[in-house]
C-alpha cells in the first residue's frame, strides 16, 4: 500500500494491479483512492473476482478502469492464452478491455485486436537473450515499428463494416450485364437463347432476367450494345 502512495507522488498517470493481487482489496482500494487510472490484470481470475475488484475501485469514486486479459506463463503457451474470454469481458463490463501479451511473436496480439480489445500491452527489451523469463517473449527495439504497423493495418482493415464507394465501383466493373448474342430486329420477342452475359455490370443484371424474357425489342439492337430496359416493350 505504501508503494501506491509513492507511485502517485512520482507523478504516475496509471497504476497497474497484477493478476496475483486481484483479491488484494486493501491494495486495490488504496490505488483507487489516488484517482489515477487503474489497469487491472485478470490472469487466472474468475469473472466474479474481476467484478468484485471493479466494485472496490468504483466504491472509491474511481471509474477510470482498464481490464486486462492476460494468461499465465513466461512465455505463455498458445493453448493457455484463452482469447475467447475477451468476448465475455466486453459483454459484461463497460470498461476498455486490454490484452496483456505474454506470448512470443505478434500473431496473438493481432488476433486479440480483431476480437475487439482497445489496448495491447507488449513488453520491450534491448536483448532477448538476457537471462530472464520476460525477455524471450519481448520485442527488441527494431521489432517495435513492424509491430505497430501491423496493429495499424488491422485497425484500418476493420474500420469499415459496409461496402465502400470503391467496392461499389469495382463491383460494377467485374459483374455482368445482359447482352444479345446476335443482332436482332425491332419487334423480336426475346427468349433465353437470344441472351449472353458480359462485363461490365452497369446494365440489366442477370438476376433481373425476368424483366427481359418475353419482351420485344423497341428498335434494332446490336450485340455490341448493352441491353437496357428502355430498349424493351411489352
Where are these regions (language model features)?
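Catalytic cores and adjacent flexible loops of soluble metabolic enzymes
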Residues: 1-234
Amino acid at each position: 500500500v505504501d508503494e501506491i502512495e509513492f507511485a502517485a507522488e512520482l507523478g504516475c498517470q496509471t497504476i497497474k494491479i497484477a493478476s496475483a493481487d486481484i483479491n488484494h482489496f486493501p491494495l486495490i482500494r488504496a490505488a483507487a483512492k489516488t484517482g489515477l487510472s487503474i489497469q487491472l490484470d485478470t490472469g487466472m481470475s474468475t469473472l466474479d473476482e474481476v467484478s468484485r475488484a471493479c466494485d472496490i475501485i468504483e466504491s472509491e469514486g474511481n471509474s477510470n478502469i482498464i481490464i486486462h486479459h492476460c494468461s499465465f506463463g513466461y512465455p505463455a503457451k498458445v493453448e493457455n492464452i484463452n482469447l475467447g474470454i475477451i468476448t465475455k469481458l466486453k459483454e459484461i463490463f463497460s470498461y476498455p478491455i486490454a490484452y496483456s501479451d505474454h506470448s512470443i511473436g505478434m500473431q496473438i496480439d493481432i488476433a486479440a485486436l480483431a476480437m475487439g480489445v482497445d489496448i495491447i500491452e507488449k513488453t520491450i527489451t534491448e536483448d532477448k537473450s538476457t537471462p530472464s523469463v520476460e525477455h524471450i517473449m519481448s520485442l527488441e527495439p527494431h521489432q517495435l515499428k513492424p509491430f505497430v504497423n501491423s496493429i495499424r493495418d488491422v485497425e484500418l482493415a476493420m474500420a469499415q463494416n459496409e461496402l465502400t464507394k470503391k467496392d461499389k465501383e469495382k463491383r460494377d466493373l467485374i459483374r455482368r450485364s445482359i447482352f444479345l448474342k446476335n443482332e436482332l430486329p425491332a419487334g423480336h420477342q426475346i427468349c433465353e437463347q437470344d441472351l449472353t452475359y458480359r462485363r461490365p455490370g452497369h446494365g440489366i443484371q442477370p438476376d433481373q432476367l425476368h424483366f427481359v424474357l418475353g419482351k420485344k425489342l423497341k428498335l434494332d439492337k446490336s450485340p455490341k450494345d448493352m441491353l437496357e430496359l428502355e430498349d424493351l416493350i411489352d
